Structures are given as structure tokens and as C-alpha cells.
Amino acid sequence: MTKDMTQGSPLKLILAFAVPLMLGSLFQQFYNLADTIIVGRFVGVDALAAVGSVGGLNYLVLGFVNGIACGFSIPISWTFGAKDYREMRRYTANTVWLSLFFAVVLTVVTVALTRAVLVWTNTPDNIIDIADIYIRTIFWGIPFTLLYNVTSALMRALGDRKRPLYFLLVASVLNIGLDLLCILIFRMGAFGAAFATVFSQAVAGIGSLIYIGRHYPELKWSREEGRLSASHCLKLCNMGIPMGLQCSITAIGSVVLQGAVNGLGSSIVAAQTAGSKAAQFLSVPLESIGTAMTTYASQNMGAHDLKRVDRGVNTALGIGCVYSVASFLILRVLDVPLISLFLESSEVEIMANARSFIFWNSVFYIPLAVLIIYRYTIQGLGYSSLAMFAGVAEMVARAMVGFWFVPLWGYFAACIASPVAWFFACFFLIPAYFAVRRRLTKELAAARVED
């Protein structure tokens, strides 16, 4: 089921697209919480700290996977908006070829380097073996993660926001069930949690692929359309790699910061893990508004309607601000119950540190919303490389906090690292959007004169 976003109310279109994604993201965060809760409660604080200690490394790699998948979908969305279905099928076929290549390369490289990176980031000795087993298992599942992300991005590029949600719900329920089975029944520890995640991603990815094959006849390419094309691959890489690097570059700062936090001890790592999981429960769904704006901006760019893009940006900013304020208020009320899911009530100091992390992150959700909306819109307009520099700004900010301020201020510096990074990125992205907007206006005006 496709959806044309070049006609109709931007508010209704963005909400109709974003709300199912938000629900899916909330459910995904719920099963991520469940995953962490089960590990923390039934495996132990060390296992909780181990899973948390590789959070930055996990995002470094899987963020790249998600980024290239989203980037590959942008030319597909352009050609769909322009009603050029022949080119759309060519881009789809070459997306498949590139995905196979990246799946193999990323799996081999990450599995080989995992232990060395854990040592480099000062992972405490009492949790390094658990962390190694957990993240290495996740990396073995990269092909399935990429499959799910590519198929979901492809459906969203054509305006279908419901089907990816359905497959995500299936994966979420399956993941929770397998967590309970692997950890409580089979006593597989952190490896069981990682295995449950990989298996669930595999089911969702394969299911999405089968669904696309059966219900999207417009994507079935001919033999000629399915050939590997250097020009199409180059265009896809120009979109996908910068978006992937944007996530990875951002995560490099997180890895550096995590190394500094790891040096504060496993109790602090456990507090940061619990706090970040609780804070992300409501912050990550903001990405759904950004994802909606990528598709919205891409389709309207294909239709050469930049004024509609502006209306969409203003609408999305309003939605993001309302959501951010509501999320902050909810977390102020529910922070203790959320943290209590991960930790025993006797862990008083860890719980207090986790609450501090939640407060200092949630109070700055509005700049996070602004960052996400402008970043994804710029990507949808075809300037993924420019959006990547916002990731550089975030990386620099987090690395600065890790190198300089964590040694001086301790855990408080870790709590404010992400808000500092969000402000750094906003200072770059807001003027960048208006520069892109002016450039595209001139290009479209020149094209109309030539016609």
C-alpha cells in the first residue's frame, strides 16, 4: 500500500505517517526495556552494566546499518514522487546488490574487531567477557538487521507506514518471549538476550521481504532493470553512506564518552544504562517524526514543491515541541517506577544516579526534536553529506565531554553530554537547512526558465 504525500494537509499526512512509527518505536523501546529488565533482574548488575557498556559500540555499527538503509530509500522515494516507476525499480534492484555487499563486509569486520574495541574503551575486567559475548552475537546478526531495515525503509519510501509497524510488533513480542525462554529457562545469560534480538530481527526481515514480494508488484523489476548499475549504485551510496556515517560518527563520540564513564566503575555504568534506557523510552520515538519528514521532503522534492516542504517542517516542529514537553512531564512522574524495573530497591545510589541522567536528558528534548526534524528533512532533500556534518558536531561534543569534563566533573558530565551534543548539532543544522532551501529554489527556478 503506497501513499502520495505531495497532496493534502501536511499536518494530517505527517501525523498519519509518524504516529504508527511512534507506536512502533514505543513498542520497540518497550521490548528494549524488557530485554534490559530481564538481564538486570535475572542475570545481575554486572550483566546489566556489560550490556550498557557496549551501547555506544552497538549504535556505532547498527546506526550505520540503519542509516544506509534509510539513505538507499531516498532515491526510491524521489522517483515514486516523480511517478518514474522504471527508475524506481532500478534503484530498488541496486539497493539489493549493495545491501548484500555491506552485510558481508560489516559482519566480518565487526566480529573481528570486537574484543580490541572493548579493551580500548576501558571496559571493566569484571564485565568485559559478558560484554564481548553479547555484542559479538549482535554483530553476527547484522545481515538480518540490514534486511529488516532495508525492507522497512523501502515500504516507508512508498508511503506505507503500517506494514513496518506490524512486522516490528511481531519482532518485539517474539523478542520478549525468547528473552524469557533463553534467560529464565535455559539460563543462557547475556548471550541469550543477544540471540533473542538477532532471531527476532531475522523473522521480521524475512517476513517483510516476503510481504513486499507478494504485495508490491510495482517493485518487481525486469531482467534489464535488475542489472547492477554503477550510476545507480553511486547515487544510492551518495545518499546511504553519508547517512550511515552520520550515525556512526555520532556514535564515535558516544564510544569515547563510554570509555570515560567505564573508568568510573561498573556501578556508574549500571546507573547510566538504566537511566539512558528509561530516557530513550520516550526520546527515541521523536525519530519517527524525522523519518516521516524524510519521506515527505523526498516526495515533494520529486514533485518540485519546496513551499510544501517548508509547511511540513513548521508542522513537524510544532508536533515535536508538544511531544517533547509531554515526554518530560511523564518522565518526571514515572522516573522512579521505570528505574525500579531494572534495579533492586536496595541499590539506592545507583537509582539516584539514574534519576539524574533521566532529568538532564529529558529537560532538553526540544532541541533534540529540532535537531531530528532539520536533519531528516535535509537528508530527504538530497543533502545527506551536509547532514553528516551535524553528526560530526555531536561526535566532537561528546568526545570533548569524555576527554575533558568527565575527569573533572565525574558522572554529572556524562549526564549532560547528550544535551551538549544536541545543541552543537542544532547550531549547524538550522542555518544549513535555510542554505539548502535557497540553493534548491534557485536550481528549480533555473530549470523552469530552461523549460
Language-model segments: residues:
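Small-residue-rich hydrophobic transmembrane alpha-helices
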Residues: 48-108, 145-164, 258, 271-335, ...
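Transmembrane helical elements of multi-pass membrane transporters/channels
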Residues: 16-35, 137, 148, 171, ...
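Hydrophobic transmembrane alpha-helices of multi-pass small-molecule transporters
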Residues: 60-63, 175-180, 205-209, 281-284, ...
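N-terminal transmembrane alpha-helices
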Residues: 5-42, 56-71, 75, 100-107, ...
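Short alpha-helical transmembrane segments in multi-pass integral membrane proteins
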Residues: 1-18, 76-141, 185-241, 297-364, ...
